């Protein structure tokens, strides 16, 4: 899971660096008995940023929920890739007391429709998979956004991936309990970087039933 944070926050782009990382991962994957799939995310909200992400030749691209601001482009793009598993929708949201769960764009003041409203539209537009992030949890090691995940899982039968906030193996156990309700996986980041647990330990927890 590779994120162009500069693009996501409107500070430029890390395309060249990501290209080098993708090449290294592809080389490692060629030597591995299990292929390594690459998912690219961060700031993909229009034709230009999607083209930049696709130039990296990833297995999947996450289109940010900020693309809801241009619903015509998003609808056309989802239709173009309707028969492919190439695109996922990165559903970024924040809880606002007056409105409930609302879609947002990181690095901006933009807020879009309520999550329930956005999901109803996205389901009709043909989204095949959601990467769900409570932005107040992302990078915080404060635990996963279970409340937001509950809202999303109730409303869709598409695969859902949790992102942000995981700090411990106990968090993974909690997320694993959501698998019967449609949770497909989890994105790990800071917890691995700071050494809270190893990737091997995470796989052991996630793989047990």
Identify the meaning behind each predicted range.
Residues 1-2, 36-42, 61-63, 87-91, ...:
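Hydrophobic faces of well-ordered beta-strands that scaffold small-molecule active sites
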Residues 1-17, 65, 131-141:
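Glycine-rich, proline-tolerant flexible connector loops at the mouths of alpha/beta enzymes
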Residues 5, 43-45, 66, 92-96, ...:
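Active-site beta-loop-alpha junctions enriched in small/polar residues
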Residues 10-39, 76-92, 143-168:
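Alpha-helix-loop-beta-strand connector modules within alpha/beta enzyme cores
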Residues 18-22, 50, 71-78, 115-120, ...:
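Generic structural signal for well-ordered alpha-helices
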Residues 36-61, 147-182, 197, 202:
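Catalytic cores of alpha/beta
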Residues 54-138:
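Conserved anion-binding
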Residues 73-81, 176-179, 183-188, 192-209:
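C-terminal helical cap(s) of enzyme catalytic domains, especially alpha/beta-barrels
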């Amino acid at each position: 899971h590779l994120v162009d944070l500069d693009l996501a926050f409107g500070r430029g782009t890390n395309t060249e660096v990501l290209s080098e990382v993708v090449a290294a991962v592809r080389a490692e994957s060629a030597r591995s008995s299990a292929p390594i799939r690459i998912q690219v995310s961060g700031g993909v909200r229009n034709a230009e940023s999607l083209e930049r992400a696709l130039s990296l030749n990833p297995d999947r691209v996450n289109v940010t929920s900020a693309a809801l601001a241009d619903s015509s482009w998003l609808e056309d793009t989802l239709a173009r890739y309707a028969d492919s598993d190439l695109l996922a929708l990165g559903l970024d949201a924040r809880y606002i007391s007056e409105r409930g769960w609302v879609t947002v764009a990181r690095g901006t003041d933009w807020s879009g429709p309520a999550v329930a409203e956005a999901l109803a539209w996205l389901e009709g537009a043909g989204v095949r998979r959601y990467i769900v992030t409570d932005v107040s949890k992302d990078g915080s090691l404060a635990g996963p956004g279970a409340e937001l995940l509950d809202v999303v899982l109730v409303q869709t039968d598409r695969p859902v991936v949790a992102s942000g906030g995981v700090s411990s193996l106990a968090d993974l156990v909690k997320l694993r309990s959501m698998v019967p309700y449609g949770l497909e996986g989890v994105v790990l980041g800071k917890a691995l970087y700071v050494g809270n647990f190893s990737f091997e330990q995470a796989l052991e927890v996630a793989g047990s039933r």
